[in-house]
Amino acid sequence: RQVYGEPDELPVTENAPIKKATSPYGNTKQINEEIVRDTVASGAPINAILLRYFNPIGAHPTALLGELPNGVPQNLIPYLTQTAIGIREKLSVFGDDYDTPDGSCIRDFINVVDLAKAHVIAIARILEKKQKDKVETFNIGTGRGVSVLELINGFEKATGVKLNYQIVGRRAGDIEKVWANPDYANNELGWKAQETLEDTLRSAWAWQLKLRERGIQ
């Protein structure tokens, strides 16, 4: 999603214009795509598939594999689960005055297992020489926009755990709202996000509990 910047139209398709990145992280995403395209265009004997992730969240349903950020998490779900379990005192919600139904930012949250499956399909497509172009691009998202406050409420409902959160000022570089149009990936790759948001949030919480059980966090 970072390659699109602040989109003009929603949901975002692969043909949406690439705008100036709103953060250094977004800029690296755009640069990485340019490097891949330039490498293929140079005549290198390779093809490529660019998967444009939206917001991966969750963990493997067995709770044996998940996200373990170093230090203070830079994305929402680890910070949320660490707050829920008591590692962090409070979760900060950056802004409630955006032009969205509840004022908080909207994102397309995709289960990390669904995302991993998209990689398997993409690799098979390259190896089996099924690509229609030397470089193909696919949005990997659910097609559903969920606000930060909706996500918090969804976590509380899915787990029965109340979150201590506070509204703070906007964070520089945050995009107001963005979610994918995944139709091209659905139709061309035969891939579609399967996991519900509720199950994804439960998996994230189960992973955090497993970390506590192992004495890691």
Q: Model regions: which residues?
A:
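A short secondary-structure junction motif
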Residues: Y4-G5, L10-P11, H60, I87, ...
